[in-house]
Amino acid sequence: MSYIKKLRARLDSGEISAVELTKEYLAKIKEQDKRINSVITLCEAEALKEAEDADAIISAGKQGLLTGIPILHKDLFCTKGIRTTAASKMLDNFVAPYDSTVTKNCKDQGMVTLGKLNMDEFAMGSTNEYSYYGAVSNPWDLERVPGGSSGGSAAAVAAGFAPISTGSDTGGSVRQPASFCGLTAMKPSYGSTSRFGMVAFASSFDQAGVLGHYAEDVAIMLDAIAGECEFDSTCVGVKQNHFTQDLEKDISGKVIGVDESLIKDLPAQIQEAVSKTLDNFKKLGAEIKSVKVPDLKEALSTYYIITPAEAAANLARYDGIRYGYRNPEARDLDELYRKSRTDGFGAEVKRRIMIGNYVLASSQYDSYYNKAQQLRKVMTDQINQIFTQVDAIFMPASPSEAFKKGDKLDPVSAYLSDIYTIPANISGLPAIAFPIGFANNLPVGGQLMAKAFNDNILTQMVVQYQKHYGIEEFILQQARI
């Protein structure tokens, strides 16, 4: 079950050329994205040139699995010669002089870059309402959010603008949008994909991820972008075909841990979807085992102390001098710094910078930042201990279905929507979200988390699940291939 393989067959048979396929997707984006607002920069000329190159490779019989396959990138991956904004006024005119490792790996595989995607500014948000370029709409219901921060990445694939997209995941930023938009998305183990050329939010949490309809497509794409990188010292890489190596194997004997206390207070329809999903895994031969997951509220508090601290340090580079927005009315250096950053950053980014600077202040450092780091270590050890008993841990991907725009503009309310996804980022573990049912006629997602660098177990389990139980009901008509 793979859109990439379906398109590969069409391209190889000559049913359609890469240029024709690219034109189809570009036309759909231009016609339909006005109501969704998922694309910041459409790369029409560049895409058609890349498609022509792909057709030449196909004609010569030298194509790979991804040659000529269209893709959309979250607009925090640097793309040489193309604007990279991170959805911020601060970088509105920034044209990257180099490619990120993620986008370069895609280009090297012959993929066609259709454009750059909307997101929460600097990846800070869970609703995609915090963008300089406006909020993104959920294709399932245009009055609702697509999730965040990779909301554009999820909305674009759900709307059929590309078969696959890249995103980043700092606290659930590919998995929560996937849950809201009926997609499959994965945050791989920390260090398996390079962060070089990826605009930084919180460096010890950030990781590139992928969103698509099918788990097999997600696995194929992660194999394409993963690997060692000489420009990222935290990138340890993974062996070739790490994500796709076990997709055909059944999951009989796999043990899935479930903490019932995380499910009992969910809305009834989501509880039903979770129960049905676990029953289906049992039918596939998996064993369900009761486990105790560390307190998620403590995880949330830890996350929202450490990540703003890292963000405050990372965003200090935007000073109005070296690059980025510069206020034209400043009369001296101090005013230039102050006005450029005040005007260039949105409200949510400024909120997190202020929190970060507060917890890093000498008077607060031990009370907040140090304690949060200690708790992060304790929680990571506790989660890893669970994996001595199980192969994966199952949780919901979000406590609700997609909510309406404006419903969670209160920051704390919005932060709570990350409660199930944050543990994987705190501990650097791989996690995959996939559609499991509906609540109020909107898709909801489940999530599996595994031990570090056991990513292949997750892709295997979800590919087998989707092979037996299908996901057609989660694919909107306009996105079908």
Swiss-Prot record:
Active-site positions on this chain: 74 (charge relay system), 149 (charge relay system), 173 (acyl-ester intermediate)
PANTHER family: GLUTAMYL-TRNA(GLN) AMIDOTRANSFERASE SUBUNIT A, TRANSAMIDASE
Function according to Swiss-Prot or TrEMBL: Allows the formation of correctly charged Gln-tRNA(Gln) through the transamidation of misacylated Glu-tRNA(Gln) in organisms which lack glutaminyl-tRNA synthetase. The reaction takes place in the presence of glutamine and ATP through an activated gamma-phospho-Glu-tRNA(Gln).
Domain of life: Bacteria
Keyword ATP-binding: yes
Protein name: Glutamyl-tRNA(Gln) amidotransferase subunit A
Catalytic activity field: L-glutamyl-tRNA(Gln) + L-glutamine + ATP + H2O = L-glutaminyl-tRNA(Gln) + L-glutamate + ADP + phosphate + H(+)
Pfam entry (one): Amidase
Gene Ontology CC terms, in alphabetical order: glutamyl-tRNA(Gln) amidotransferase complex
GO biological process: translation
UniProt lineage: Bacteria, Pseudomonadati, Pseudomonadota, Gammaproteobacteria, Thiotrichales
Keywords of this entry: ATP-binding, Ligase, Nucleotide-binding, Protein biosynthesis
Self-association and partners: Heterotrimer of A, B and C subunits.
InterPro entries documented for this protein: Amidase, Amidase_CS, Amidase_dom, AS_sf, GatA
Protein family per UniProt: Belongs to the amidase family. GatA subfamily.
Organism: Francisella tularensis subsp. tularensis (strain SCHU S4 / Schu 4)
EC code: 6.3.5.7
GO molecular function: ATP binding; glutaminyl-tRNA synthase (glutamine-hydrolyzing) activity
SUPFAM superfamilies membership: Amidase signature (AS) enzymes (SSF75304)
